[in-house]
């Protein structure tokens, strides 16, 4: 069981002052409102004329209404002072609020990390499947020579184009050109290697 906190003398005096202001303002509002209700009551004939009595009651109502407004403004100022007092002096509550906010942010961070890890694993699995599909498909091979992925898809699109399907000789010509370029590159490499050895 937590022991009640002991406030310093200055803070204790300040709280007592706040309490006194609260009681005085509430009493002022109640008393002035009661007097306004009494003033609104029509009395019997007195020595003062009715017109004079009406003016006097009217002035009294204005004064008491102003007192009620002043007491209300004082209460609003008291609320502001209490908020400031709590913000500046209630360190346990402030620390508790900070700890609660930190816990909420940590929970949110953990959820985001879990989602990112799950997304990373899914992307890795999909990428692995795409690589397996690419290297095991025929479009990834060209006469025993592996092609880059972009070139393989480009050639696959070329095979499926209407021009290639309508003109087989064009496809054969492209294949022969590719083989010729491969052979020329191989001869060039062999020739350069022979010259270096000599």
UniProtKB/Swiss-Prot annotation:
Keywords: Activator, Nucleus, Transcription, Transcription regulation
A Pfam short name: Med22
GO molecular function annotations of the record: transcription coregulator activity
Keyword DNA-binding among UniProt keywords: no
Subcellular location(s) of the protein: Nucleus
Disulfide bridge map: none
Residue segments, region Disordered: 159-198
Function of the protein: Component of the Mediator complex, a coactivator involved in the regulated transcription of nearly all RNA polymerase II-dependent genes. Mediator functions as a bridge to convey information from gene-specific regulatory proteins to the basal RNA polymerase II transcription machinery. Mediator is recruited to promoters by direct interactions with regulatory proteins and serves as a scaffold for the assembly of a functional preinitiation complex with RNA polymerase II and the general transcription factors.
Name by which UniProt lists this protein: Mediator of RNA polymerase II transcription subunit 22
